[in-house]
Regions:
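Catalytic cores of enzyme domains
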Residues: 65, 69-217
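Non-catalytic, usually N-terminal nucleic-acid engagement modules in DNA/RNA processing proteins
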Residues: 1-72
Length: 217
């Protein structure tokens, strides 16, 4: 199995490289099991069918002609469907996870947490605003994932580098963020973010623009 994982991972990475994806990683779904007590689905039902997640990320504003219609979301979706066809041709299951897959729009809960998948796939760490922060792109990127049963090697995790930084918390115009000094993931989203006062769905980008990692990237 280990040798198969090595071979399949190399082949998949070679295929993804042709798609010109900014960043991507692989997560072992079993790593999520103990992480999220308030997860909106029962992960046990998925572990046998979809033990791995392939997570793709694209930075906003740097896609140029790569994106159909200039839209990051569409570019990522096209890449994801190409990977799904790749998996189908090899005889493996595939299930796409979108940002828009909300089953609880009021509380902005998705079918599955893309942020959690991205973190476990080594794309970045979860910042004080709960956004995924990539060393290369900061918090300014979009995510999509494909779940599969193709045996793969998971990426190494990236250590949380926010430390005691509170820039996003202090900049939030709605005071929707509370500082919680977690290293990996807070036990509850509500401890960090008041989702009902957050203006993210209305185009507010303050927590993104105030992040020092955006400037570094």
């Amino acid at each position: 199995m280990k040798e198969q994982k090595v071979v399949e991972t190399k082949n998949l990475r070679r295929f993804i490289k042709k798609l010109e994806i900014d960043t991507y990683g692989i997560a072992d779904m079993h790593l999520l099991k103990e992480m999220e007590t308030g997860f909106p689905i029962d992960l046990n039902n998925f572990l046998n069918m979809f033990p791995y997640a392939i997570v793709l990320g694209a930075q906003y504003g740097k896609l140029g002609k790569k994106a159909s219609g200039g839209k990051t979301a569409l570019f990522l979706e096209e890449a994801a469907f190409s990977i799904m066809e790749y998996l189908e041709d090899k005889g493996y299951r595939q299930l796409i996870i979108h940002t828009e897959d909300e089953f609880d729009p009021i509380n902005r809960l998705g079918f599955m947490s893309l942020k959690l998948l991205a973190k476990k796939a080594g794309l970045g760490w979860q910042g004080r605003s709960l956004l995924i922060i990539s060393p290369e792109y900061g918090p300014l990127h979009r995510l999509i994932a494909i779940l599969t049963d193709l045996p793969l090697q998971n990426n190494q995790l990236i250590k949380n580098q926010c430390d005691d930084c509170r820039k996003c918390i202090e900049a939030c115009p709605q005071n929707a963020l509370t500082f919680v000094g977690f290293n990996d993931h807070p036990s509850r989203r509500e401890d960090v973010l008041d989702i009902k006062t957050c203006l993210g769905d209305n185009g507010c980008l303050v927590c993104i623009l105030s992040c020092p990692w955006l400037k570094k990237s």
